[in-house]
Amino acid sequence: MSTIIDVYAREVLDSRGNPTVEVEVYTESGAFGRAIVPSGASTGEHEAVELRDGDKSRYLGKGVVNAVNNVNEIIAPEIAGFDVTDQAGIDRAMIELDGTPNKGKLGANAILGVSMAVAHAAADFVGLPLYRYLGGFNAKQLPTPMMNIINGGSHADNNVDFQEFMILPVGAPTFKESIRMGAEVFHALKAVLHDKGLNTAVGDEGGFAPNLGSNREALEVIIEAIEKAGYKAGENVFLGMDVASSEFYNKETGKYDLAGEGRTGLTSAEMVDFYEELCKDFPIISIEDGLDENDWDGHKLLTERIGDKVQLVGDDLFVTNTQKLAEGIEKGISNSILIKVNQIGTLTETFEAIEMAKRAGYTAVVSHRSGETEDATIADIAVATNAGQIKTGSMSRTDRIAKYNQLLRIEDELGEIAVYDGIKSFYNIKR
């Protein structure tokens, strides 16, 4: 047993230059843990509360001094004396201390920072890598990466409506080879865009953010890049999209406005028709948040139409929340959940969501946020839970590469017992 003797938080910066919370946990044994909390740009309205100061004279109101103070002055005294390996007990104590359904009092960014730092300190205490400490001996599956190589929507300053266009190197034999394939397609895409006279600047998640004429054109240039890199789309590499449709859903009209394509006032059924058409024309294996987070009828229709052959991921739809996920499972909506630790605010609740998804035959995709840091905890979480898939950005920006590099280290450490399932990680659809 090693008890917690001190918890300390500070304000640091994320990849967008905005403040976020870093937490350190100290124990009587000398074991130590540190973690930094990520932040999202497009957020679901049902997410746990990210506490910001709102003081416009500091960081344009985005400071997190209040969250930091909540850790140092309220949470730290409460969990001092806890056994550092009592993750569930510590998380439960913080949830009760907050006392709100959405962690709105202390802030999910305060609570999560402590939750993750505790796990790191516990792993340090028992002398195990984080993935092994959290997942035990069965933690050995490397995730199939979903690489966001074209950014649009709220992640980029361009006229592409959909937020992310991804490549999934499912044909690779190992995680290491999947990274190589992804990097080669990324560099091929840069050349394709350059030759077309398009911008090769990158967005928040490291993908390119060119001013393309339509969402379809984004898919077309990616296909061209896959072929230029020497691979076959629909065989070695598949495509994925995070539509983030809540960002262009008009709540007043109840319709969808694809401004970049000059198409406005689309109904849910028309959006479903559009996705079905795209899936016929391109090897799309995954669509995230195809309809607004509150358009459950639309999600149901999408699931009925293409859910047998396309992974339909709920991000804003489920917000890593077991209550929302249970409702979706009961109603037969989507077939996958995106897992973002800061949407729910503790590791314990994160693992509960992953387990619930798996029991129901849903896939689970561990995900970064658009505002990231050098913290690579989610890489260990993906392996610890054998989630099978990870979404952590493109092949550029250190805040994204940090996760890939950690996964490469884990694969190397696992050696012959490492598993990379590739296409088999999409176990609930027919391909």
Swiss-Prot record:
GO terms for biological process: glycolytic process. It catalyses: (2R)-2-phosphoglycerate = phosphoenolpyruvate + H2O. Binds a second Mg(2+) ion via substrate during catalysis. Pathway: Carbohydrate degradation; glycolysis; pyruvate from D-glyceraldehyde 3-phosphate: step 4/5. Mg(2+) binds at D242, E288, D315. It comes from the Bacteria. (2R)-2-phosphoglycerate binds at Q163, K340, R369, S370, K391. CDD domains: enolase (cd03313). Its EC number is 4.2.1.11. Its cofactor is Mg(2+). One of its GO terms (molecular function) is phosphopyruvate hydratase activity. The active site is at E205 (proton donor), K340 (proton acceptor). GO terms for cellular component: cell surface; extracellular region; phosphopyruvate hydratase complex. It is found in: Cytoplasm; Secreted; Cell surface. Gene3D superfamilies: Enolase-like C-terminal domain (3.20.20.120), Enolase-like, N-terminal domain (3.30.390.10). InterPro entries: Enolase, Enolase-like_C_sf, Enolase-like_N, Enolase_C, Enolase_CS, Enolase_N. Its main location: cytoplasm. Keywords: Cytoplasm, Glycolysis, Lyase, Magnesium, Metal-binding, Secreted. Catalyzes the reversible conversion of 2-phosphoglycerate (2-PG) into phosphoenolpyruvate (PEP). It is essential for the degradation of carbohydrates via glycolysis. Belongs to the enolase family. This is Enolase. The lineage of its organism: Bacteria, Bacillati, Bacillota, Bacilli, Bacillales.
